[in-house]
């Protein structure tokens, strides 16, 4: 697939493919966009618009780094290309962001594809942390806890966050030999602020309260062996009228990496059911 680079304000991204328009929203938060392979997988289904979110190189952008600001950026990208409505295809934190768009701006969406997303329930974090505890050494776990404490205190550095991803990265894959490279840049302030915004919305139960009113098609695709527990996705999907869930076997947090074609196949079957 041939992609073309674009700049929309401070955001740097790429567009390509053919079909219905779709925003591709990466996870992290505050890491460079890594969804090129997913865009390639979906190139015959969607015209994709993917970009690195604000506050992280190669994109710029000043604060605020909140869920609201990231939603506004997504709509700005659509506006820049004259797209009235699009699919929101998000992975991990990006899937969570897509669900917020569904609640706050359904008039700008055609539907949502949430790939191994952070769901609506804060309790999933405890199980995710427990899974990492089993997979990492005590020293690695202690270092992750130390860095996370510094992030919560607003004192973390980019180098520490890059180290954090390097330690935790193998746990995102069922087969570590298939792991893609971890991020080498993290927007430190963006990471701090997005996580604070996440906590605020979890406490306000934004998605739990808003998703039952959704009236657009929503597909969840989740790795069977992901560090994010499958129940987080199935229970989040249970809040959305008519939502469908596909669990990808022998896959961790990146289904399109460990089981190439799995996300495309799920989307194609889902679209066929809408016709």
Write out the residue ranges for each language-model feature:
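Conserved alpha/beta-hydrolase catalytic His-Asp/Glu region
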Residues: 148-201
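Active-site loop/oxyanion-hole signature of alpha/beta-hydrolase fold enzymes
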Residues: 49, 53-93, 265
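Flexible "cap/lid" loop of the alpha/beta hydrolase fold
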Residues: 112-151
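Conserved hydrolase catalytic core segment
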Residues: 84-128
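Conserved HGGG/HGGXW glycine-rich cap/lid loop of the alpha/beta-hydrolase fold
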Residues: 9-60, 77
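Catalytic active-site module of serine/aspartate enzymes centered on a nucleophile-bearing elbow/loop
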Residues: 243-275
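Conserved alpha/beta-hydrolase "acid-adjacent" motif
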Residues: 227-232
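Short beta-strand/loop motif that positions the catalytic acidic residue
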Residues: 214, 220-222
